[in-house]
Amino acid sequence: LPGWRLAVFTGVPEFGKSIGLRSFKQYKLFNGKLPAQLLLFEIQPENARTPRDPAAPGQVMPRIANPERADMLRNRLKKNLKTIGQWARKQNIGCYRLYDADMPEYALAIDIYEGRVHVQEYLAPKSIDEKAARERLAEAMAVIPEVLEVAPENLVCKQRQRQTGTKQYEKQAATGEYFNVHEHGCTLKVNLKDYLDTGLFLDHRPVRHWIQQHARGKRFLNLFCYTGAATVHAAVGGASRSLSLDMSKTYVSWAQDNLALNRADSRKHVVEQADCLAWLADRKTANQTFDLIFMDPPTFSNSARMAGV
């Protein structure tokens, strides 16, 4: 009833998101040795919130089944935050990998995107019990927001699998939740939920920075350009012109958006949908010359033009 108060004592604070109310007080306590929280609510219309749907894309309901094992992950994340996180802050890097299956019990990749967290669970081999794998993932999803001090709505979880055919390009969800991140003076658009990948390959960061440092006055070619992040670095670095090609119309549009975010001249920095291998084999291509070429072909072979994705 309006005006009443509600108290919930839980070892899984994430369950509080399912109540449909915003808590006005949160107390960190213990249930024996288990960390817990006391959540206080006022039943008022203005405190209503949309209950979190555990079946929604990227949602895994957290639960700690083995506190000792969860403590191991908690301590590892704290250690990585102290070392990798400190290094990233000193380098003014906002997007980086914090954890990459450091512990065999938790086969995850945890990436930071300027205050948001992207978690990918590596597909467990058939020898691993599926129930045990789900249990460990639920533990990780309880520990990660606690250690990283991130709101649950800013944490996304996916299962990482080897992609074949056009699956790498297909949508996993349809939230349309894009936001901008920053890297060496460039603004880049990312999406943590809708696709297998986010729009920014973190392991390419040193190469992108090198391109930016060496692009001034150069003609730049980006084959299999994905979202065009390398082209953005080239443009920001002063490339005289660039051509970026990809088979996916989704990523061609994304690359164009990235260039527009950085005020690159679309007449000088062109993005086109094309089969890169066919383009290389075309005799007309021989008349075009470039000073810098970046080529990162996908891990699968697919000769069909992906005109519809």
Per-region residue spans from a language model:
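Class I S-adenosyl-L-methionine-dependent methyltransferase catalytic core
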Residues: L1-R63, D194-L196, L200-H209, H214, ...
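Conserved hydrophobic/aromatic pocket- or pore-lining residues that grip, position, or stack substrates
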Residues: L188, V207, F224, D296
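Non-catalytic nucleic-acid substrate-recognition regions in nucleic-acid-modifying enzymes
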Residues: E46-Y113, Q120-E139
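Redox-cofactor binding/interface segments in oxidoreductases and associated redox assembly factors
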Residues: V119, F294-M295
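Class I SAM-dependent methyltransferase "Motif I" SAM/SAH-binding loop
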Residues: N222-G228
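Non-catalytic substrate-recognition/targeting regions of SAM-dependent transferases
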Residues: C95, Y99-D111, A133-L202, H209
